[in-house]
């Protein structure tokens, strides 16, 4: 047991950089010293106070940001439709809601998340006993790549929007930095989930690779046994043919060969009717090829190499298969616990991604029509910045959905690999073992969902893509209808004003005519 503990590398050892950044940002409340010294995530009262303080600070700064840049929002309702105003008001706070959901969930689960990674460490020890050594160095590289990509996307969106679309001549414009805090914190939180999910997928694949290795080893063992069996010597075309009564009709067709010539030619090497050499036994000059000069047949495959197979002994391999299935069940339970810990943050992220993707495209359309848009969505005024924002937002959602789907597929593939062991061994006892374990594996697969509302798989991604397209078309149609109604009202008001002016002018003409008639009548002397 001590040897397994020394050989197994803790998974949390690869989270050093991510933990320090998350701790400074106020995402995790766990104790810093215990993680640095023993790679453990344990509760911390000071960490909880620091996390709540940063949460309150972020909320206050975000509201100050909205108030400072809200001049455009206050004039938005008067200049645009109520639909655009309501959408902008709701989506202005959805990023803040997502950030609060991430931090409060981390605060609630601060004790359970440490237990989760401890269970993963115990799984690694059990896999090590079965010959599966997990290499966690790839996880460390993935974390660094994700952190670098996060910084690049956040800085690209923040700097480009600040330079092109914000009046940075005023000192209040520095508050625009606060607009990047919710998405940055959300991304750091989702890196924890994504990397942990990837670690589970690697362990499923390690079990599948072990079962596939058993199958390959047994196939090599069968080839080795087949190679040691006696193989009949190859036919030599230089020797005279032996008589076969079943081929008598063929002998008559090949030059009138009689039955007696076969026996004589076998003894003396000559005969009256001798079958001419076939084409592949002659060279290009029509000369017979010497049998001694031909290339000898290849030797049997690895006849001097001994291949042992665990599947050849059903009683011996039963314990290994049982252990692998138990580890598989434990990984599935860890996956369910992981999904439960991040269920609300995943739901908020998917809702945020769906709404922001649709709204960003809608506000891009509004910007092309020279309409006012909410202040925090001013990035939609620039198509290049819009592409970066959409790539960043959709990339997080799509990657988590894809990784969840691949992890679920890897868990279900274990049953296929297990059945291959039974098929290649062709042993009744092993068949019974495989069938018994397969019944257990039916309940071991894991599926990831967002609070049970929808499953994180490719079908959901396809449905979300169609929903974004449909709602975007509906919003554009509503916007067109609102603009047409506004233009109609303006036209009607202008016609009323014109009609009023015409009526006033007509009345003035009538008054002038009446006054002229009165003066004329009064001033004219009576005859």
UniProtKB/Swiss-Prot annotation:
Membrane topology annotation: Multi-pass membrane protein
Pfam families from the UniProt entry: 7tm_7
Keyword line: Cell membrane, Glycoprotein, Membrane, Receptor, Transducer, Transmembrane, Transmembrane helix
One cellular component (GO) term of this entry: plasma membrane
Tissue: Taste hairs in labial palps, labral and cibarial sense organs and forelegs. In larvae, is expressed in neurons of the terminal external chemosensory organ, as well as in the dorsal, ventral, and posterior pharyngeal sense organs.
InterPro entries in the cross-refs: 7TM_chemorcpt (IPR013604)
Transmembrane segments: 47-67, 81-101, 145-165, 175-195, 346-366, 383-403, 461-481
Topological domains, Cytoplasmic: 1-46, 102-144, 196-345, 404-460
Glycosylation sites: 496, 510
Gene Ontology biological process: chemosensory behavior; detection of chemical stimulus involved in sensory perception of bitter taste; detection of chemical stimulus involved in sensory perception of taste; male courtship behavior; monoatomic ion transmembrane transport; response to caffeine; response to insecticide; response to L-canavanine
MF GO annotations: ionotropic taste receptor activity; ligand-gated monoatomic ion channel activity; taste receptor activity
Extracellular side: 68-80, 166-174, 367-382, 482-527
Protein's cellular compartments: Cell membrane
Family in the record: Belongs to the insect chemoreceptor superfamily. Gustatory receptor (GR) family. Gr66a subfamily.
Role played: Gustatory receptor required for response to the bitter in taste neurons. Gr66a cells respond to bitter compounds such as caffeine, theophylline, threonine or valine. Flies avoid bitter substances, suggesting that Gr66a neuron activity is sufficient to mediate avoidance behavior. Required for sensing and avoiding N,N-Diethyl-meta-toluamide (DEET), the most widely used insect repellent worldwide, as well as to L-canavanine, a plant-derived insecticide.
Protein name: Gustatory receptor for bitter taste 66a
Taxonomic lineage: Eukaryota, Metazoa, Ecdysozoa, Arthropoda, Hexapoda
